[in-house]
Amino acid sequence: MSKCATPTPSTSSNSSDEAKRSPQPMSRGFPQRNMSTTSSNGSNSPRHRSLETPIVLQPATRFALANLTTTVLRLDFWDDNDPNSIFFCKSTFNIVTQCLDLPEKVIKTVKTHLEGEEDLTDIAPMIMSVREDPVYKTEGSTPFLASLLVAFVNQGNYDSRYRVFLRHLTTLLGVVWTEFEDVEDSLASTLLEEQFVESEHSRTVREKTARNKKIKRYLMIGAAGGVGGVLIGLTGGLAAPLVAASAGMLIGGGAVAGLATTAGAAVLGTTMGVAGAGFTGYKMKKRVGAIEEFSVETLSEGVSLSCSLVVSGWIESDTSPDQAFVHQWRHLRHTKEQYTLRYESNYLMELGNAIEYLMSFAVSVAIQQTLLETALAGLVSAVAWPVALMSVSSVLDNPWNVCVSRAAEVGEQLAEVLLSRSHGKRPITLIGFSLGARVIFHCLLTMSKRSESVGIIEDVILLGAPVTASPKEWSKVCTVVSGRVINGYCETDWLLRFLYRTMSAQFRIAGTGPIDNRNSKKIYNYNLSHIVKGHMDYSKRLTEVLNAVGVKVGPHSEDSVVDLTQLEGPHEATGQAEEAINYQSTGEEEEHPIVHPINLENIHEVKVLDSPHKNEF
């Protein structure tokens, strides 16, 4: 019979303040979290849920769930030309059928649908069959999904494709995604609140491996990380399994019985990244290329089975150094565990100052009119721009070109960090605007060249990206992203066009228009022209932009979201000129973004951009 897990309330442990750390200018990993700070007594911690009550599903329900999951795998993940996707689908199918405890004959029948030997069945009767089950009527579909979650995590690698797969299932089974996130967060808190210690056997194996491979330096890095005295390298913890005391008692039995073992605790420690020294445990002894500053800092103190990393595009002159990479993201609530990348702050500060200086020359009515006509025509030729603007262009060109080059190198370095799994073997979402989006884009391009890159990145959100709009390059990015790749653009971003004025007329910038996504179901284009009044608005109105593309943001006052159209000074010209552009183009272009019809292959998409919470993920 099938056993699934039912979430029920449990207890929590005490919390204490985390010791303050100074930022590490050249660190290579996520900050190590103090276990005590992740207690559920904190305001951001989830309610505890024990995953232990066995639930028995009817045979018809189990068969329907098997067919439903097989259909999702076949339509959304199977690719005949990609061996990795085929392997993922088959291994996931095996986990699901094992969880459902199906007879071998039934498994063989359902598997023919997965492999394309038989036509897929209609999903509507499957969903109706599930809803008729007594368990569904009393508990909903969450017990089954929670059981799958535990089974996936117990593999020691919460692959980002697992999470996207579960997201698709929650949509079909009518489970609110935030409720499922509560289950994830509860499991994460339960695991991280334990006191992890290294077993004697693990220590012996680790030390022997270290001697053989001459990686004593990595052991010292592990000591600096300070995770209960565990000395490990950059692998995220595979070389040093951990033992969680009383894990079996606190996690419970039933569907999670496998997690109560020493091995289960070890792989979960690896999944969460708690077995690793974290990003701050490693300090680069020398520069990587031209990079002078690279570190990942904590943005929020929660814990989760997934995390987010944000990358800013520049630093504004009125921002303090400590808040330079934090303030813009202060309302972000995408996941409970969020990080921000600090990189090349001196150069990004110079760029911010240069942009503000250039904008001060765009105040006159004459220049506004010229910018209006130039942007409307979509011109990038140097001869089309005002002489007054061109006369000071060198002030911006030099810092921009320096930052563009360094952003690409930072992206390559970020790829190495993510491939090292310092954040743990769990999904991570990347969000960036302007040059931050460029960092992420080059990170993904670098990862696309590596075979071990699949299953790490869940979603990617690029806003005002100063990168090519070539479908060929974006298709490479899609190969390493399990979920969505969002391109947020502004058609009237004259500053971005101005910065690329020396490029050929055939060159298209992603931040100024949609990406051709006819051959990719992962790419989503969002026209943000009705929110963004200029390139600098990606920083000033970031909360509104994030809300528009479906990223969760926290409560905020109207004063905290700046309306640039009401500001005086350098930003005024941008707002007035581009409001005129929007007004003149109302009859010719759609105000809303390009969208696709919702189907099973793209069940995580939303049509209406102006309904901020419909596309949350």
Curated annotation (Swiss-Prot):
Residue intervals passing through the bilayer: 219-239, 262-282, 427-447
Gene Ontology CC entries for this record: membrane
Family recorded in the similarity comment: Belongs to the TMCO4 family.
Pfam families, A to Z: DUF726
Compartments it resides in: Membrane
Source organism of the structure: Caenorhabditis elegans
Membrane topology according to the record: Multi-pass membrane protein
Keywords: Membrane, Transmembrane, Transmembrane helix
InterPro entries to which the protein is assigned, alphabetical: AB_hydrolase_fold, DUF726
Protein name: Uncharacterized membrane protein F35D11.3
